[in-house]
Amino acid sequence: MKRIFDHPAICYHDFITHPQVSDNAMSQDTAIEKHYGRPGLLKRMLRTLANKGISENDLTFETLAPVDEFHVGGLDATRRILNRLTLFPQDRLVDLGCGTGGPARAIAAISGCHVSGFDLTREFIETGTTLNHMTGMADRVSLAQASILDVPAADATFSHAVMLHVGMNVADKEGIMREAFRLLRPGGRFCVYDVMQTGDGALTFPLPWASDPSFSAVVRPDAYLAAGLAAGFMLEAQHDESAGMARMLTSMSDSGSANRPDNGSDPFHNLARHIEEAVVAPTEIYLRKPGKA
């Protein structure tokens, strides 16, 4: 099974830039798009896959996984979340901060449901929309540029929601929870999968989602839970998914940056060390909106 970590050298380093974005005059939305946006993304993705023997005619959610599942655990984590959500073809799911749509396509292909994804970064949306057509998924996956704090959809539109490795860049956890609650139908579930603070140590930057502390919004699981409860959600489950992840991240960094000095400048070495030291943990939180589906 292919995961983001099975092809470490073609992961984050090839597709994502790490500019300094601490200018106080820059809005958070602008900073996020500057951090993640980089022209020519689709060409780089297809070229990378071609170098691995995967042609444009072979594109599926599985063959694309090495270059479009940008969260700890990759496609395996997406499958795990899908199993825990228990989706059906008649469901409508919203992916808050969808990136290029990798998880959205995987969820739609496996469950048969329709997925709507929203992301601030235009390059991600344009690339993902093209990939939807190239994989034959355009009828079940739709992507649009928008802030996850202000999604252009009516109240109670979706059966379920996911947010995968997005909250680390968004300080307004209360706003995230309020918007997810608004979008969900009664009985709907919201899966948050983020890297969360679990220990007392200070974070060393850069990290995969931030070049410096001004762009990082990592908090403890309790902060997510408090925001969720305040929005009206009920806690259903919480899972620490750290097991084995530090080793995978170290392997990924070693393969992708063999010539880079070990001086704290590699985001994956830093993240792997923090997970190993229990400073942070990839954590899933499942919340439910009261009422019957």
List PLM regions with ranges.
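N-terminal auxiliary segments of SAM/dcSAM-dependent transferases
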Residues: 11, 15-50
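Conserved alpha-helix/loop element of class I SAM-dependent methyltransferases that forms part
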Residues: 54, 71-91
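Class I SAM-dependent methyltransferase SAM/SAH-binding core
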Residues: 92-150
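A short acidic, Gly/Pro-enriched loop at the edge of an enzyme's catalytic core
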Residues: 149-161
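A short SAM/SAH-binding and catalytic strip from SAM-dependent methyltransferases
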Residues: 160-172
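A short glycine-rich, Lys/Arg-flanked "PGG" loop and its adjoining helix->strand segment in the class I
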Residues: 174-189
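Short, glycine-/aromatic-enriched active-site segment of Class I SAM-dependent methyltransferases
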Residues: 195-215
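Conserved Class I S-adenosyl-L-methionine
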Residues: 237-293
